[in-house]
Structures are given as structure tokens and as C-alpha cells.
Amino acid sequence: DIFARVAPAQKLKIVQSLQRQGHVVAMTGDGVNDAPALKQADIGVAMGITGTDVSKESAEMVLLDDNFASIERAIEEGRTVFNNLKKTIVIILPTNGGECLTLVAALLLGGLLPILPLHILWINLVTTVALAITLAFDPVEQDIMRQPPRDPQAPLIDRGLVWRIVYVSGLISLGTFGLFFYELELGSSLEAARAVAVNAIVFFEVAYVFNSRYLNDSVLNRRGILGNRIVWWGIAAVVIFQVVFTYWPVMNSLFHVAPLDAWMWLRVLGVSLMLMLLVEFEKAIARRFALRSQATPRLRTNSEV
């Protein structure tokens, strides 16, 4: 619908009517009389050049150039920042969850600890930070402006992402346990097995960084793998950190680990690739269920007829 030459009071009624229908409403204005509508709207947009001080104080956004095209750019940037914040959280929490599950399971089973508290500090303070920061600089996703407005009442982490955090935490814990005890079965020393466990968690994280670049879509394409150079710089830094951690005698003595041979590295990298593919498989299933739920017709109630 188009409303032309409406009075300020009518602007307020339009905003209230659209909000009652469940829409997220943005309203522009520049005069004193526009203040009630700007205040009522979910996003009030005032003019920075011609707007009055009252309208600017009532609005959430001020267009410094009075150019309406700036609204679209601001929405795109805001959605990108919000998505990147979610990606950063989604990469950090499963790592912490996997570490906790590994330690709790080891304590409950009464066996050897695959990782020590000092290893957790290393992972969280060095490698996790280096990887998580890179997602804060992820570029704009191609379809971000085709997505519907986000529900203001929706939580930052929805049920789907909570499930993914739990799912990936379990995969990290299982992979760490499996590699640790497999190395012990092969006759490796406890120090070497723990070095494998620590490197496994780190490279699980590296693989999961790519999964997290797209929260719903597949990352198995050129843009998903190569679309963010900063991610690759972060991975390069993590690889250097882990080489120092694994092979420098001072770090070996400090963290109670031992150097790894080529076969150990192959096992770590192979299981990391498996984790990445398993997460992509989970995302594909989630997309299929989402499409099926959207395609299911909704019955109309008597009040809607």
C-alpha cells in the first residue's frame, strides 16, 4: 500500500497498525510533529541535515546525508555485524563445551586425562581467540538483504544454534577421546598422546571455522573456503603457534607434551576433515527440514477467515 501526503498523526496510526499485524516498522521524519511516530516505530529514522533536534532525539537512526539509500546500506551493515557476532559465539562455545565434556568424561570414567588444565588455557587464550576474531571480519553474505527482518524478541542464539553447539561439542569430545586412546593403544607415550589431543582440538576448531562462516548454507564452495582472507591469516597464525607448541623443547617441558610424527599429524587432520563434513551434513538436514516446514500449508483459523 502507498500512503501519500499523510499528516504526522496519520503516520503514528500507520506505524501502530502495521505493528499490530506483526511487522517490523521503520519510519522516517524530519519535523517536530514526526517525533511520536519515530518513537513508536521499531526503527525511527531522522534527517541529519534538515531534521529538527526533537526528531533526531526521538529516532534510533540519523541520516547524516539525508540520503534514503543510506538506510539500505545501514541495514546491510547492521545485519552483517549481528551475523558475525553470532558466528563468533558459535565458534567459541563448542570448543569450550568439547573441552568440558572431555574432562568430565575422563573424570567419570576414572581414566587418564587427555588434556590438562594448562592445555585448556593454551587453547582458549591463544588459538581460539586467533580463530574467533577472524569471523568478526567476515564479508557480507550474498543473500543477506533477501532475508526477512529479525524478530526483536528472538534470542541471540536460537534453538537450532543451541543444538549445533551441543552437537559440535560432542564431536570434539569424541574425536579428542578417540585419538588420545588410539595413540596410547599404538604404544605412544602419554606426552605424545596428549600432544595429539591438544592439536586435535585446535584443528577441529580450524575446520569448524569454515563451517561457521555460513550458519545455514553450505560452505563447500569457492566462496565459502576462500571468501575471507583474514580467516586464512588466522589459520596461518594458529599453525605457527601449534608448531612451536609441539616441537619447541621449552614448550614440551612446560606443557608436558612430546613432538608428533607425520602419521600422528595425518590422523589429526583426517579426523578434523571428518568433523567438518559431519557439521555440513547436519546443516544440510536442517535446511531440508526448514524447507519442508515452509512448504507445509498452514490451516486458517476462524478468526482469520
Predicted regions and their residues:
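Cytoplasmic-side transmembrane-helix entry/capping segments in multi-pass membrane proteins
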Residues: 221-229
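Membrane-embedded transport module
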Residues: 1-27, 41, 46-217
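Small-residue-rich segments of transmembrane alpha-helices in multi-pass membrane proteins
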Residues: 229-237
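Alpha-helical transmembrane segments of multi-pass membrane proteins
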Residues: 123-127, 200-208, 238-245, 271-279
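Short, Lys/Arg-enriched, Gly/Pro-containing loop segments at transmembrane-helix junctions
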Residues: 141-148, 218-222, 285-300
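Residue-level signature of transmembrane alpha-helical entry/exit and packing/kink sites
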Residues: 116, 164-165, 231, 264-268
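Hydrophobic alpha-helical transmembrane segments in multi-pass integral membrane proteins
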Residues: 175-179, 237-253
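Cytosolic catalytic headpiece
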Residues: 1-33, 39-43, 85, 107-110, ...
